[in-house]
């Protein structure tokens, strides 16, 4: 892809650092590279990236078998926050702090693991008052997805007095934010995880912990004992099957992920005999109006207060490749944010 004309692009240095993933046969080379500004796409908004974050999808984007990356070479990073240095449309002011996530960022369009980015205007969300760029990436796609899940459940009728709520994959990015969001809104939250050191979830507000085995066991029964008023499920697979089979009459499961697989092993019985709803949560193509609304909520009444002190790790751009390897190996937990540049 070619960049803007030199006259238009002087706001970006001739060269800058970026993590570039290049497919070579069945291998993906991941290296911190000095990039040329002409490598950036032709998009209206130039951003000096200050912060990004690590997501499971980023790890898949640099995996030979991930089936996520749609171009090579690619700067991965499905989240970014930083400062506008130029907007060719004139809608944004230089110096304005913005965030970008979803759409094709870090998948079919160079993403957040570089010191500079160019993105379409209609992907950009001005960071609401009350949040800084670092705060936005502490939440990132994971926090946004957690908020979409909680709001989706409440819009489907969930309320704290209806009973306990299950959060699956609770030590992951979506899960840990969902635990705190639900707990601070008055819900009794039970957190499920396969990680051995998960007591910090109790400090986020979880009422109790469940093992992954308890919430992902296969079953031939179409229905099980009604236990949950609702569930936030970023895992998928047999976990979704368990959640739906054990959700109470009229409850809902908000499904946003597939780390546990795509076969959920369900019959129609929970839906037609208990009125259970399975809500699809998509953070990638969320319309911009809804996106802005959710970020306003995350800056105000939905803002988590304890995630940073309990579950956030900060790394440099030079350590991103190693962090992605850890995620692929199943070693990641909590939120990892990336400080880009100075």
Label for each model-derived stretch:
Residues 38-54, 65-104:
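Glycine-rich beta-strand-centered segment in the early N-terminal region that forms part
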Residues 3, 7, 12-14, 292-342:
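C-terminal hydrophobic helical "lid"/dimerization subdomain
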Residues 183-239, 296:
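Adenosine-nucleotide cofactor-binding segment
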Residues 100-166:
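NAD(P)H dinucleotide-binding glycine-rich loop of Rossmann-like/cofactor-binding domains
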Residues 238-304, 339-342:
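Glycine-rich phosphate-binding loop and adjacent beta-alpha segment
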Residues 143-144, 169-176, 236:
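Glycine-rich NAD(P) Rossmann-fold beta1-alpha1 loop
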Residues 99, 229-232, 254:
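N-terminal Rossmann-like NAD(P) cofactor-binding module of classical short-chain dehydrogenase/reductase
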């Amino acid at each position: 892809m070619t960049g803007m004309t030199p006259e238009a692009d002087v706001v970006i240095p001739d060269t800058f650092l970026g993590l570039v993933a290049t497919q070579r046969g069945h291998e993906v080379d991941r290296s911190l590279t000095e990039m040329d500004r002409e490598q950036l796409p032709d998009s209206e908004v130039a951003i000096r990236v200050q912060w990004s974050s690590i997501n499971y999808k980023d790890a898949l984007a640099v995996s030979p078998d991930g089936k996520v990356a749609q171009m090579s070479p690619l700067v991965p990073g499905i989240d970014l926050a930083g400062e506008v240095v130029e907007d060719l449309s004139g809608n944004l002011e230089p110096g304005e702090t913005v965030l970008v996530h979803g759409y094709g960022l870090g998948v079919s369009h160079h993403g957040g693991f570089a010191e500079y980015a160019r993105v379409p205007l209609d992907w950009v969300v001005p960071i609401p008052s009350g949040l800084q760029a670092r705060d936005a990436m502490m939440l990132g796609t994971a926090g946004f997805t957690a908020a979409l899940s909680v709001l989706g459940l409440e819009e489907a009728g969930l309320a704290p007095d209806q009973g306990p709520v299950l959060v699956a994959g609770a030590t992951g990015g979506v899960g840990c934010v969902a635990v705190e969001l639900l707990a601070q809104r008055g819900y009794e939250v039970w957190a499920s995880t396969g990680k051995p050191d998960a007591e910090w979830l109790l400090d986020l507000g979880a009422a109790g912990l469940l093992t992954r085995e308890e919430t992902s066991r296969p079953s031939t029964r179409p229905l099980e004992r009604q236990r949950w008023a609702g569930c936030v499920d970023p895992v998928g697979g047999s976990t979704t099957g368990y959640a739906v089979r054990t959700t109470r009459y009229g409850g809902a499961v908000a499904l946003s992920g597939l780390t546990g697989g795509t076969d959920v092993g369900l019959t129609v019985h929970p839906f037609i005999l208990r009125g259970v709803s399975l809500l699809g949560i998509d953070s990638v193509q969320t319309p911009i109006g809804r996106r802005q609304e959710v970020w306003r909520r995350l800056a105000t009444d939905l803002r988590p207060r304890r995630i940073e002190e309990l579950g956030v790790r900060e790394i440099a751009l030079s350590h991103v490749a190693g962090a992605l390897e850890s995620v692929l190996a199943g070693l990641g937990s909590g939120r990892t944010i990336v400080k880009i540049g100075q």
